[in-house]
Every structure is written in structure tokens, then in C-alpha cells.
Amino acid sequence: MIALINKILFSNGYERLDIEPSSSNEIFYAFYLPEGHQREEYFVTIQLQEQSDTAAQELLYEKAQILFEEISNSGKVDRPFEKNCTLLICHEEEKISRQTILALEEDHYNFKKNVITYTSNELESLESYIIENGIEKIT
């Protein structure tokens, strides 16, 4: 799912920041709009390699702040990052509780957070649709 979300961001003019995570359980990418755009908006996409409700709670209570600080202190983002960044969390639907999703999305600290849940069948169907219809850019 994270590859699909990243493709959407690339298709809409976002560029990837080169930042390495300090933790090995997450795959994450940071995106920004290059100079010349009228808004300063950042997105961070993340997918836990070992997905579980407990791992998602760790992201909420510990790792999101660490990730936020790593990106903020990287020297690769401007001051507006602190107020204009959305964390898109890709997580398999059956491996996260509704309560944890709400806790993540309602958390007011560091990032604005959105959880994108999916099933394996939904992801496979969407990927097949994109390939079968020759869709190269998703805007």
C-alpha cells in the first residue's frame, strides 16, 4: 500500500526527502513540494514491517515523536514542517483495532495523522485495476 500512496504523491508533484529511519520496524518516506509551489506541505508515509495493534500503539506513544524529531532536526525541512505535515499510516485492516485507529487520528501531537487500512484482497484488486487499465499517474 505504501508504494501506491507514494506513487500518488509523486504524481502530484511531491519530491522525496532523503532521510533514513533510526528504527528498523518501519518503512517510511518523507515528501515535500519543491520551491515554486504556493504552499508548504509535507507528507510522511509509513508502514510497519511487523504489523500489529501493539506495534501501531508503539508508533502512537513513542515512535511518532522520535520520527518527527529526526525529520525536524535533519536540516532538510523548513520551519513550516512542524505545522504542515501529515503522517499517512498504511496498515492492514485486520491487524489494528478501531480504537487504535481513532487514537492515532485524534492525537494532536507532532504530525496530523491519517490511517489508511486495507485488506490483502483490496490491495491486490486495486493494483490489478491500475495495471490492467495502464494507469501511470494517479492524481
Locate each region found by the language model.
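Short secondary-structure capping micro-motifs at structural edges
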Residues: 68-77, 98-104
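N-terminal "first-domain core" detector
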Residues: 1-73
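Charged, structured surface patches that assemble and position nucleic-acid processing machinery
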Residues: 20, 103-139
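Conserved beta-strand segments of the P-loop GTPase G domain that flank and frequently precede/overlap
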Residues: 44-50, 86-93, 116-119
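Switch/connector loops and helix/strand junctions flanking conserved nucleotide-binding motifs
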Residues: 54-55, 96-100, 124-127
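"Short basic amphipathic alpha-helical interaction patches in structured regions
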Residues: 59-63, 98-107
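Nucleic-acid nuclease catalytic cores
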Residues: 75-98
